[in-house]
Each structure stands twice: as C-alpha cells, then as structure tokens.
Amino acid sequence: MNKRNKVKQLNRSADHRKAMIQNMVISLLRHERIESSVAKLKVARSYAERIITRAKRNLDANLANLDEQKKNAAILHNTRYLYSHLGDQEIVTKLLKDLANRYAERVGGYTRIIRLVNRPSDNTAMGILELVDRKTQDELKAEAKAKREEKKPAKKEEKPKKAKKEKAAASN
C-alpha cells in the first residue's frame, strides 16, 4: 500500500539530502538567486522560509516585551540555531543584519520559484529560486559604478615634461 511521505526523498540518502539542501539555502542567501530542478527548489524554499522567519525573531519589535536578560538569551539562542543549521558565519551575519530587516514587514513568502524550460538532456523541469524584493541587476550595476567613482582618486595636474628635461640638461 502506498503511504504518504512527509519528506521528499529526492532520490538521495538522508545525510546527502540534508547537506544538499543546506548548501542550496546558503547559496540562495549569499547570491539571492539559484537555479536548479523544481523538485529541489521546492524543498529548499520551505527550508529557506523557516530560516528567514527564525532570523526575524531577533528584531527588536519581536523581543520588546522581554526583560534585558531574556532578550539577550533569545538573541543568542536564535543566532546559535541559525549557525548550527547554516554553518557559515558570513551568511548568518547577512541574514540577521540585512535580510531580517528587509522582510520585517512581510509575513512569509520571502522567496519565489520562476519556472524555466525543461533541461534538454533528461527533460527535468528547471527553475530559479530567488528572494523577493531583491535588487535587480541594473540596480547592482549602478551601485557598483557609483562605488568605483567614489574610489577613483582625483586626477593630478600634469606638469609639462619639458621642464624635467631642461633641469636635467642644465645640471650637466
């Protein structure tokens, strides 16, 4: 008799599946967009949504009714939970500082799956999993260009090269 499965198997062992989903979520949080098969993206999406919701618990609005000691304990607990599930301090920091604030007003639905054409080799349904409200490529290019303009040193005034040659000739 066919029984319902609570976990999508994805044709992998439990350890392999856990590592794959963890890596997909880390890549999603780092690059804010990943491409894979739709079946994998659906599993990664549910995991990513839970992780972002957990990060939102550290916001001051969610901890307002706690005293200082309990607030610090809750922040520490949530941070350690995220680190134990993601294993990357850079991603946990980005999650707590940037993404939690970005989605503070949103109640769920932090990601979306955009379906692409099927993969030609095996006809697997492909898709893109991306964070909602992320910056577009044009905005990122404009920001990068603005940063480059700020970092460029002001051009120095060029002195005529003849003056150097005349000084060298005068000293001989």
Curated annotation (Swiss-Prot):
Residues 140-172 are annotated as: Disordered. GO terms for molecular function: structural constituent of ribosome. Residues 140-160 have a biased composition (Basic and acidic residues). Keywords: Ribonucleoprotein, Ribosomal protein. GO terms for cellular component: cytosolic large ribosomal subunit. SUPFAM superfamilies: Prokaryotic ribosomal protein L17. GO terms for biological process: translation. It holds the Pfam family Ribosomal_L17. NCBIfam families: L17. Part of the 50S ribosomal subunit. Contacts protein L32. Belongs to the bacterial ribosomal protein bL17 family. This is Large ribosomal subunit protein bL17. The gene is rplQ.
